[in-house]
Amino acid sequence: MGSTVHLLVIDNRDSFVYNVVELLRSLPELTFEVIPEGELELSSLPEHDGLILSPGPGVPSEFPRMQALIRAEAGVKPILGICLGHQALAEHYGARLVQLPAPRHGHASALVVIDLADSLVGAIPTGSLVGRYHSWAVDEASLPTGLVPTAYCADADEGRVLMAMRHRTEPVWSVQFHPESMISEYGRAYLSAFATAVRAWH
């Protein structure tokens, strides 16, 4: 692979993917290509070192090609899920989704990092603001033993909501918040940490 990382960004029909792309363009020794979820063909995937599953509307079951990609690639190539991608990874491993009491769209929350050793959220100081755009969340109590919670938010009007997790043994990470949002203070650092993790895996 060398030092340059090549990522596939799966576009789940969401305009935020363009913000993800802009952050990726700012990172050194990294190339990428964007594939619309509806055009995914497992038999003809381009060569890649890792995957980013973008945000998107609705729930993971509305994106069957992304779900098939997760089944094929989880544990094989490093994966980062963002928002919808985070929820899809959680469901793949057996966790459940819950609906929030009220949607969070363009909402700023303070991140509480609980796994300082995690190579991705460890790049974000506790208390940093993150941008949230979701009405569903992963039920932290339903996480199987293979998934480790790494960060959460705890706004006064909603209690603790899982914001990040990783797989205990596989190169899988995900976040409910949007690192590419202008609200998120350390989004570039988070994506850079994922690129570093991809290099380390290979």
Where are these regions (language model features)?
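Catalytic beta-strand/loop cores that center a nucleophilic Ser/Cys/Thr
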Residues: 118-169
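Generic structural signal for residues in well-ordered beta-strands
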Residues: 32-34, 97, 149
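Histidine-centered divalent metal-coordination motifs
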Residues: 83, 134, 178
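Short loop/edge segments at beta-strand edges and connector loops
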Residues: 36, 99, 132
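Short loop/helix-cap segments at secondary-structure boundaries that form the rim of catalytic
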Residues: 25-26, 42-47, 89-92, 140-144
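N-terminal beta1-alpha1 cap of cysteine-dependent amidohydrolase-like domains
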Residues: 1-67, 71-75, 84, 185-186, ...
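A glycine-centered loop/beta-turn motif at secondary-structure junctions
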Residues: 158-202
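Cysteine-nucleophile active-site neighborhood
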Residues: 48-123, 129, 191
